[in-house]
Amino acid sequence: MIIYKDTVTEDEMFSDIYKIAETPDGMCFEVEGKIIQRVEGAIDDALIGGNASAECQEEDIGGATTVSGVDIVINHKLQETGFTKDSYKNYIKDYVKLVKAKLEETDPDRVKPFMKGIQDRVKLILGNFKNYQFYTGERMNPDGMVALLDYREDGVTPFMIFFKDGLISEKC
């Protein structure tokens, strides 16, 4: 399995269990998810040697809660955050500087294409700004990547957008 992490914070953003496609401009990964519902916090009696009594048929799931949402968000503990258009512009300026600095260290040949492509990508994001929900990594570090959540034309299928140059991949 390959885990994709934020280069700035090293927060886990997504993995290769999802359908991943590179955007036509080569700047981002689109990661397709699903809406899921899962019970968290339940303890399986079989794991602790318990045996449910036939006399007591109550539905006690041990303080468990039901969580529903996009699987990418839930599985990788992404945290929702909010932006106005102006606050996103300020954030993205700082984020681009951080990614550029990382690229200068790790992949200098990628700096020029990144700086050219990111301008058009940001214009595209700002043009569709009202469609997006914004997510940071688990630590909610304000310097880290903010992933974008949108839905396909069917209005049902969620997908997330991650800046390709802001990610490192780690094989597990």
Swiss-Prot record:
Q: What GO cellular component term, any one, is given?
A: cytoplasm
**Domain TCTP residues, every copy:** 1-172
Q: Where in the cell is it found?
A: Cytoplasm
UniProt keywords (A-Z) are: Calcium, Cytoplasm
Listed Pfam families: TCTP
- InterPro entries for this protein: Mss4-like_sf, Mss4/transl-control_tumour, TCTP, Translation_control_tumour_CS, Translational_control_tumour_p
Gene3D superfamilies according to UniProt = Metal Binding Protein, Guanine Nucleotide Exchange Factor, Chain A
The record's comment on protein family reads: Belongs to the TCTP family.
Say what the protein does. Answer: Involved in calcium binding and microtubule stabilization.
Name under which the protein is recorded: Translationally-controlled tumor protein homolog
User: From which organism does this entry originate?
Assistant: Xenopus tropicalis
| Gene from which the chain derives | tpt1
